[in-house]
Amino acid sequence: GSFDNHFSTIGLVGMNEAGLNARWLGCDMSDERTQKFTREVLTHMRNRLSDYQEEYPGELFNLEATPAESTSYRLAKHDRKRWPDIRTAGSKGDTPYYTNSSHLPVEYSSDIFDALDIQDELQTLYTSGTVFHAFLGEKLPDWKAAASLVRKIAENYKLPYYTISPTYSVCKEHGYLSGEHFTCPKCGKKAEVYSRITGYYRPVQNWNDGKAQEYKNRTLYDVLHSKLKKVHTSVVTVTEDDVKIEPVETHKYLFTTSTCPNCRMAKKMLEGEDLE
């Protein structure tokens, strides 16, 4: 084995709090000034990674909105200990944590499109994993509501990944329960509440203290009452008279890299084919 096809991943955490603590900003990610600063930081990071790519031939680098499930709590806890007056996420007296990557504060808005309008300009600057989580209190009323939301996001925003993430609970006696129920409404016994911590669902009771505080602070999105304000797509009617089809010469291309073992296998298998 080798590391030839592995990426060196670079990310950031707590950009929202960087805006709060920066004396020349003093505002969170909902403010245009911190959004502008974040775009500049991410663009600088992209450029540096591009330089590294040229400086270290054969090495792969990517800019990712790293999950930071434990790091967002650990760094905030140590920073608070060293600098007691530092601004972390949440309110005074909360367990310290940092907002993940360049996300908005978790209590920002119940209107999902308000959040998407801001995140769309930031998440598209990452070159690797990034995701917008649509945290919902309960599941949507039916599949049509889910399909409608997915379509609106897909047609009006550029961000690459998003999740529909309702909260649900599990009772040992009665199984699945929609929404947050620490006690089963049917039998009164203790139930487990599940929510998405970063990229996957886990019982809230097993989260670290920082993520547990983040869960408490979340403002859930009210999808049914959210309003799409910026329509980014337009419909253009094209008739047959508008279209002129000209014959084009076609070629088959095989794109490979020098370090990919699968590319070498593909080239060997396709020997004799008319490829460029």
Role assignments for model-derived ranges:
Residues 1-242:
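Long, C-terminal-biased catalytic regions of enzyme "large/alpha" subunits
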Residues 243-275:
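Local sequence-structure signature of Cys/Sec-based thiol-disulfide redox active-site neighborhoods
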